[in-house]
A protein has these predicted regions:
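Class I S-adenosyl-L-methionine
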Residues: 1-14, 18-115, 120
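Anionic-ligand binding region
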Residues: 122-125
Length: 125
């Protein structure tokens, strides 16, 4: 059964969880944005499909409805799709909208948060 994972890359170097790293190492497709460190993509298998959907305030390579469509399409096509998001998928990341779109399409999905800034800031202070 195919599945899409919304993986938060965390707030910086070393903030990706072990579960997130494991999913990247075993994914067949990664859909990623511009707010993450490119080095994370080196964890993906060489034959992994890579789809860039970069978004920053005022600049979008793909709008949110297009990203949702891409995620549904990938969820149908690939056994393991990782939607890799900078930071936390649910803090300004629109992860909730993406999960709702996947569920509405009948695609199995799971959220895998990275280390969020609320925790990282306190720990690193």
């Amino acid at each position: 059964m195919n599945k899409v994972y919304l993986v938060g890359a965390g707030t910086g170097r070393g903030m990706l969880t072990l579960r997130g790293a494991e999913l990247l190492k075993n994914c067949s497709c990664v859909v990623y944005d511009s707010l993450l460190r490119e080095e994370l993509l080196t964890l993906c298998p060489p034959d992994c499909a890579r789809i860039f959907v970069g978004k920053r305030a005022g600049e979008h390579s793909a709008g949110q409805s297009e990203i949702n469509r891409i995620l549904v399409e990938c969820g149908k096509k690939y056994p393991v799709t990782v939607r890799l998001k900078g930071g936390d998928p649910f803090v300004f990341g629109r992860g909730g909208e993406e999960l709702l779109a996947l569920r509405a399409a009948g695609i199995a999905c799971e959220a895998v948060p990275g280390v969020t800034s609320a925790i990282a800031a306190a720990e690193l202070a």
